[in-house]
Swiss-Prot record:
Pfam families: Ycf1
PANTHER family tied to this protein: PROTEIN TIC 214-RELATED, TRANSLOCON AT THE INNER ENVELOPE MEMBRANE OF CHLOROPLASTS 214
One GO CC term on file: chloroplast inner membrane
Basic residues composition bias: residue spans: 1616-1626
Descriptive protein name: Protein TIC 214
Family that this chain belongs to: Belongs to the TIC214 family.
Annotated membrane topology: Multi-pass membrane protein
Database matches in InterPro entries: TIC214
Keywords: Chloroplast, Membrane, Plastid, Plastid inner membrane, Protein transport, Transmembrane, Transmembrane helix, Transport
Amino acid sequence: MILKSFLLGNLLSLCMKIINSVVVVGLYYGFLTTFSIGPSYLFLLRARVMEEGTEKEVSATTGFITGQFMMFISIYYAPLHLALGRPHTITVLVLPYLLFHFFWNNHKHFFDYGSTTRNSMRNLSIQCVFLNNLSFQLFNHFILPSSTLARLVNIYMFRCNNKMLFVTSSFVGWLIGHILFMKWVGLVLFWIRQNHSIRSNVLIRSNKYLVSELRNSMARIFSILLFITCVYYLGRIPSPIVTKKLKETSETEEGEETEEEGDVKIETTSETKGTEQEQKGSTEEGPSLCSEEKEDPDKIDETEEIRVNGKEKTKDELDFRFQETWYNHSTVYDNDISDSYGDQEDWELEILKLKDKQLFWFEKPLVTLLFDYLRWNRPLRYINNNDRFPNAVRNEMSQYFFDTSKRDGNKIISFTYPPSLSIFNEMIQKKIFLSTTEKLSPEGLYNHYNYWIYANEQKKYNLNNEFINRIEALDKGSLVLDVLEQKNRLCNDENEQECLPKMYDPFLNGPYRGRIKKYYLHSIRNDSITSTGDSVETVWINRIHDILPTYREFGHKMNIFDGESLSTDIDDSLISIGELAEESASSLKLLALLAEQRGIDSENKMRYLSFPFDRVTTDPNNQTIRNEAIGLEEIGKRVPRWLYRLTEDLEEQEDEDLEESTEDHGIRSRKAKRVIIFADNDNNTNTNTHTSTENTINSDQGEELTLLRYSQKSDFRRNLIKGSMRAQRRKTVTWEMFQINVHSPLFLDRIDKTFSFSFDISRMMNLIFRNRIGKDPEFQTSDSEKARVKEEDKKEEHKKKEDERITIAELFDTIIFAQAIRGSMLVIQSILRKYIILPSLIIAKNIGRMLLFQFPEWYEDWKAWSKEMHVKCTYNGVQLSETEFPKDWLTDGIQIKILFPFCLKPWRRSKLGSHHIDRMKKKEKKDNFCFLTIWGMEAELPFGSPRKRPSFFKPIWKEFQQKITKVKKKRFLFLRVFKKRTKGFLKISKEKTRWVIKIVLFIKKKMKELTKETLIVLFGLRKVYEPNENRKDSIISDKITPESSLRVGSMDWTNYSLTEKKMKDLADRTTPIRDQIERITKDKKDNFITPNINISPNERSCGDKRPELQKHIWKVFKKGSARLIPKWNYFMKSFIQRIYIDIFLYAINMPRVNAQLFLELRIRKKMIDKYIYNDETNQEGIDETNQNTIHFISTIKSLSNITNISHSNISNNNSQIYCDLSSLSQAYVFYILSQTQVLNKYYLKSLFQHDGEYPFIKDKIKDYFLTRGIFHSESRYKQLPNCRMNEWKNWLRGHYQYNLSHTRWSRLVPRKWRNGVNQHHRIKQHHRIKKKNSKKWDSYEKDQLIHYEKDNSYAVDSLPSPKKKMEKHYKYDLLSHKYINYGYRKDSYIYGSPLQINGDREIPYNYNTHKSEPFYVPGDIAISDYLGEEYIIGTDKNPDRKYLDWRIIHFCLRNNKNINIETWGNMNTEIDANKNTKIGTNDYQIINKKGIFYLTTHQEINPRNQKKNLFDWMGMNQEILYRPRSNLKSWFFPEFMRLYEAYKTKPWIIPTQLLIFHFDGNQKKDLHISYNQKEHLELETQNQEEKKRQDKKNPGSDAQNQKDVEEDSTRSDSKKRSKKKKPKSKSNKEAELDFFLKRYFLFQLRWDDPLNQKRINNIKVYCLLLRLMDPKEIALASIQRGEMCLAAMKIQKDLAVTELIKKGILILEPVRLSIKWDGQFIMYQTIGISLVHKSKHKTNRRCREKRYVDENYFDISIEQHGKMLVNRDKKNYDLLVPENILSLRRRRELRILIRFNSENRNIVNRNPVFLNGNGSHNCEQFVDRDKHLDTDTNKFIKWKLFIWPNYRLEDLACMNRYWFDTNNGSHFSMSRIYMYPRFRIS
């Protein structure tokens, strides 16, 4: 046992326990806080450095430690925390103290009394040292925040349980760290004092006076250091005094804007949550509500008085938000309160109590003025909500706001408490009288808890009773319409059923509440107008006023605050309308009414609309007098908004005729400089301005065309507000002098690094071995690869140069005066170049030519010089003029562009060849412009590197070299000929000399012979004989001396001639052999070291003297080396290759471990694909090879159930998509349900099929369920196997809202969707399906009790349609039932279509039998509802796909009456089944007179009578005719989108010829429509339908209401860019362009990408050409060098669409497929189990019913709802979920009350219903428990499991949002509701 305790695991666990203990962690954090050294350490070091004595050191240390101890204590002691945490109290203490401190240090003897007592504690200076250290330790974290490590303590506090132990240990840790730090400082000081080398420094010794002075002024130095550090710390927070105040918008402007935008009032509150702000860590913004709009910034708490019926009242009276202005009670206010209290005797006592409670009231104005964190400085960020709202919404500090709240009657900490509510509660607490704020006793708390339970139970009981009563009414055979809970309407006359208009009805909310414009109120504020008594609007206003409660009654409720909600009081008072309607109208006061919540903000925040009504009194003369308008105040939580409407610079510029505003723009936009590129002095409109609207902005005068020049670096201003302090940038690294983008170190791997951080093994190996293995075919790269690498290198080089240019440009832009210096230098260089340098060079050149006796070229040079133009350009290079400088060029910068730059040439008359001339011409054409640099050089681009100028002397040198070469060539030829001739001459001369010598010798011989003969003859007897012994031994030589020849000849003359001939021949042979041997020897010496062989003509063999062995060895060596030398290269190659492969394999194998999971995933994916598509290999639409792999996400565990979806097998884009988060989450929930094993106990089945009698489940309902196939009673005992993927896949296949194609899914970004809905308002076109000859149904449709028709105003259209909600309810109910009832029947309809058994039942799907589509689309639902604009969000990437490229097809608009592209109906390909079927279509015909599009009426199309198209390819035209159509009515060419959608669905069925079949080139379209036409077009259909509906449904409405609707729609559609009204004189072209860009430029119609740049380049050239008298030459030159593009110029005025497309100006292209891989795609894959190929869709033909289109305009949701409740066979109930009887709000309330289970007081088991059987009473209201039957309580668990999916996740989100204020939908756990129970699977 002892050994076990010493095991490593136990030892480690023990160490971990010790390390994680509170004490150790506290010590650690305390030790860390030592290093947050702030200004407080300066005093501590000062006492030690100045050597003021031990007393001062001790007092400094004591004060320092005491201050820190107080800081630690303040964490728990609330009063101390409040005292130290209030910024104004700290400031009030610090500022005088700092002043005193500076006086103290500057006047050393200010407090010196001349004598000190012995008791050092009484010494004032020592006490001041103590106070200094104590106080600055306290100030350190608040007025001088050091946020480095101080927050760590507070962070860990929330984690540990024993908090006091943690604080104590952290203080001890801080103390230890502080002692160590002080010891270290003491050691350093001691070392400095003891170090002799420092003290004996010559400089110090020579400056003893300086040292003493330094010692004396040490205090001042410390005060300066303290001041510097204080300023540094103050730099991190906004200064409370030195801030830029915002100028407030004027009252009238603000009022107009407010009322136009929906009267969003903004409330004020003072600094009351300073402590909370510090506690919660909000360093940027206050959390609470915003200030009132019409208040002066410097007088926050002054209440603006409003005159109401002759009485003065403050806003506090009308505004129940209780501004903190109670210190300023006016007598009027007191009187009003006393009136409201009536004759209360204790009124004065209450006022005294209330005033006693307001302590320090005199301090409030100053404190609020300085420290109101809502007002005293500008906000850090300003969120602009697309100009829909008057002021921007303020960010709350956090969604995690901690406060106490009551849940289950107990006080607990809420982590998501609304901060505004917390502030409001705190303000309320200050206003409630002392008697009500007494703490309750435990008995009181218990009673309160019981009361809470009782109230909840009472609510639940009432709801349950109502629910049961409604169900019983159904059982008795009542009509469904009578049983369903209906909307309450405010009626005026019960008999005539005359209700208020929807906009005025307080009971309606959501889309029915339009916005009422109040701008007319300001014009009549002080007037009273008379109108006739039959004015309907006035009547309605009067009626509303008449039913309101009196002010006295309501005011009493307001001031008592008995704990009940005020909104409840209002509701109660509205319910008692009948009682109050009889009261006198004159005594009514107007209060807060009609505060209806409405979610129109895109960020899930709620704002409340308040509607003003005028009090109208009727006088006897039948005329009504309208009093002044009173804006109603309201009760409710507001979205906090910034007080001011701040505008950007660009926003202001977009208003053309805006007056000159003196105030600055509030928001910093991206740093841009406006450069005027054209000023039209003649007020002529520039015809080309509309082409460059994206890049140009008209100035205020409308005469100047300006370009914006943006800085080429990161936008560090990022919509910051001027005057606001921005937080210091942290987590950013800059390692370059001018870094364009500042990144966090987290993203270093994603940025282009200047030096490589990565160690690339393969790249290094390539660099090392590239030369050695490059020739090996295995390692050789292809030519395309080489070209690609070369292209990449070229791009990198280009990018590098571009970055260098940007860096230089930014350098000049950032350095002060750099632009002025550079501009001046450029102008000087331009003048020098043009008028001094170039002329002097021309003169020097021509003088030099004359000196060299050549003709001068004065004329040519001066002509080229005069052609050179120095054009002044903007900083971006936009050419202006030769003489005109850009505006503010000294500050904004300038470029000088040289057109036709002069190049000095040594001669102009080129005598070169034609090819050289052509080359020169090309070069000249390319380089005929440049930019001047500050050094006088030429650059191709602004700030580019200087290019090489053609040298003047280079051609001269070339010519000189050519001439030298020619001379050399001639000399070489001469020498060659001369040598040849001399050689021949020498040879001849040699032969001649030999001949002469021979002759001479012959003569000599003859002469000798003659002399000899003469001598013999003379002497007679004497004869001389010569000796010949030496003849045989003589050496053969070429020389024949006369002596030897004479000797030989003397022997025998005939013998001599033969011998001489042989000798001569031998000599002639030997000479060339000897020469050849010498040459070979010389050549071999270069390659091999050969022995020096002396070859002479005397030796007959060269190798005779070499030993045989040596010769043999040398021969072998020579042969071996000769073989080895060619093989050596291959040997080295193979060796290096082997090394390379080994290293490479190792480098590859390294990530193999990490890749295994991915590979397994891939294998599983292949298995899944094989599993799913095993029967579909031969089917169309699936490209197996192109399937994308699932990106590895480790959170998905059940990989085998995830189907991989590729681009190719998702071919359906017309499936229904619900783009709200709830349906996605619900789909995911169903997927999770499908993954879990189903229980073997099916209690719901037994619940339904039980024989007992229950009040809810009747036999009639059971029979109805049985006939519908919901369950089979005979199959109740069958066991349900586990749900496999196939079953759920087959069932979900029928639910088209889950068949989300990848194209659709990739666009379902919820935020984008929400924004898109609000931005792209659509005119919905609905058609409804009507049952023949059903009078009841017609009456039901006309009944106004179920109001699901949608108001077509744009303000309303952004809300989700009720039809979708009804469809969702229906789908969820079906799925729930099928999930529960699955497996009890053989042909369970999960496998097939829903409810196959009842053939005549109509369901909202469309079924096809013969050739079904890949996915179901509902036949009776407008496809526009799920193929609208909001789903089509353009993306940038266009992956390869097998779809048609639309750019090669030129469409043309057509009006063919026989077959229109527009007449594609729903996906009914089997038209033959119902010959008389009338397909519901919405046709879109393009009519030239009206503009772009015009909506026709619904056409009834009989496909049998349709004319066949001329080109019918295998019957596909008929299929194309009935393709699904998209509702792109507000787009440019809607039929193209439909074609594309159809083509994408089945790309193989639409022949290309048909797409381009009808060409009508003569039909031309104007691409622009006027602004007024746009409004007219958009409202035309809507107004007609609105009028119909108003006339039918609301007989009380009149033309004025309709006018309001129209104006609303118009107003909401046009953007409001400014605070001021837009002028009506806006040019038509600008309006057209705005409309065009806003509507159609986004997705479908786009310019050619290079076209934008071409147009910008054209504009740059136009700017120059417009200023020239004769622009022809410059224009031609610009076209030649490609600066001006003629194709981009619209020369023809009227161009057909086909022409525009042919020219490449317009490109029609589809919305591109997205390739985003994110979490949403993973969710999509979970739903992807529903995707099955079309061949598996087998449905019942009987399910299709005959329907026809009705002309009337009704919302489709009526049928949807009706089909769920009313059936063809007259059964009046089809309630899959009984709670659908109730309205949505009551349903939600019932669910929440049931889920809370308030009777269970055990906090741990929140939902005991799921955990034990005791909670089954929650279901008792649905089912009467039969006491005789032994019913298992677990049956009700199954009932809960069935009901809960119908609770729907959006309901849960609503519960979170409104009950628990959780804004984020992912924080479901905050609600403490367990969604799904854990079951034990038996």
